[in-house]
């Protein structure tokens, strides 16, 4: 059941625009907006929260909220830089919503929240004395204490020490389930999105390019632009395959390419002769770069497969792959 509906949302400033955004977000869903820097992720969150004006329609259930103030929309927002009030201590920051939502005051819920987030010992601390991870938990507590209908998270892990990121990601997932939240989370990190999301929307240059489950979006990009953003390797024109196809481009997984020293080997559906440009030995595999005419193939091969393989730069080599392993774009 859709709890948040966005129709034809448009916003323009200077040379940037959000272009006719349509989204349906279901009750209890962890929805991730995934895109590169400058793609409009944060701007879209701000328009949903009412912090930035836009045209189009935003509904919560059957209620139109696009004409309401941020306070009236009842949406919790955790900013990338946390946006905590430096003149208030931790406890005062968390309870700030009591100033405009008198009915929210609840000692029992407050106590449960600070125990869940393990911040009881921080309540009287000034904000300036907190670490990045502590600020993040306080910002989460403030958003949750307001008992908002929807929680918006803007790159919540960007200011966190990498050592604690997994711990925070795990906690976000647990909080989402524990408090039965509907969450919209902005990130540029694929692993973060894959771990957290029920559904992912790819946003590039202000446009929603693809929406689906993490498996569908991350393993089946709809077009070349999405594939490049997702870091797909070995994207080539289908003309090199010399077959009839409606597709212009294809990609082949580096782990599914075979190599042969004997240039007469043709055990795969497609094979190409090239020259080794570079090779790098890793812990348990080899990274190999092979130039085939104007194309550069990246190949990953387990060390165990290469026991009798002599490797050197400028060496001629044959590479091959099967039709079933091709992903068309």
Task: Indicate where each model-derived feature is located.
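ABC-type ATPase nucleotide-binding domains, specifically the catalytic core motifs of the NBD
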Residues: 14, 53, 68-69, 88-107, ...
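Conserved ABC ATPase "signature" region
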Residues: 64, 105-122, 173-174
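ABC ATPase NBD coupling module
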Residues: 64-79, 100, 221
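Conserved ABC ATPase signature
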Residues: 126-130, 134
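A short, proline-enriched helix->beta-strand linker immediately N-terminal to the Walker B motif
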Residues: 145-149
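Glycine/charge-rich catalytic "coupling/switch" loops of P-loop NTPases
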Residues: 234-235, 239-280, 304-329
């Amino acid at each position: 059941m859709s709890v948040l509906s966005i129709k034809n949302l448009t916003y323009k400033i200077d040379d940037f625009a959000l272009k006719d955004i349509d989204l349906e977000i279901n009750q209890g869903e962890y929805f991730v907006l995934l895109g590169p820097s400058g793609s409009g992720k944060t701007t879209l969150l701000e328009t949903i929260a009412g912090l930035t004006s836009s045209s189009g329609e935003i509904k919560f259930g059957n209620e139109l909220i696009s004409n309401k103030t941020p306070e009236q929309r009842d949406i919790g927002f955790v900013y990338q830089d946390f946006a905590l009030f430096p003149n208030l201590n931790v406890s005062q920051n968390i309870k700030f919503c009591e100033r405009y939502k008198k009915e929210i005051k609840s000692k029992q819920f407050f106590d449960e929240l600070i125990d869940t987030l393990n911040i009881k010992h921080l309540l009287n601390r000034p904000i300036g004395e907190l670490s990045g991870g502590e600020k993040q938990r306080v910002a989460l507590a403030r958003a949750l204490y307001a008992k908002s209908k929807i929680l918006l998270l803007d790159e919540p892990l960007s200011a966190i020490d990498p050592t604690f990121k997994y711990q925070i990601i795990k906690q976000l997932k647990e909080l989402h389930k524990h408090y039965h939240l509907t969450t919209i989370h902005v990130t540029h990190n694929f692993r973060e999105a894959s771990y957290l999301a029920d559904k992912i929307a790819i946003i590039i240059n202000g446009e929603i390019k693809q929406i689906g489950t993490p498996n569908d979006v991350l393993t089946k990009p709809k077009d070349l632009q999405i594939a490049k953003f997702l870091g797909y390797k070995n994207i080539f024109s289908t003309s090199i395959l010399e077959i009839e196809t409606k597709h212009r481009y294809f990609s082949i997984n580096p782990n599914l390419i075979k190599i042969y020293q004997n240039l007469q080997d043709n055990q795969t559906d497609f094979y190409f002769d090239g020259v080794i440009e570079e090779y790098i030995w890793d812990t348990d595999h080899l990274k190999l770069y092979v130039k085939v005419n104007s194309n550069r193939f990246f190949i990953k091969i387990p060390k165990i497969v290469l026991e009798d393989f002599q490797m050197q730069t400028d060496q001629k080599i044959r590479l091959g792959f099967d039709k079933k392993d091709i992903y068309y774009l």
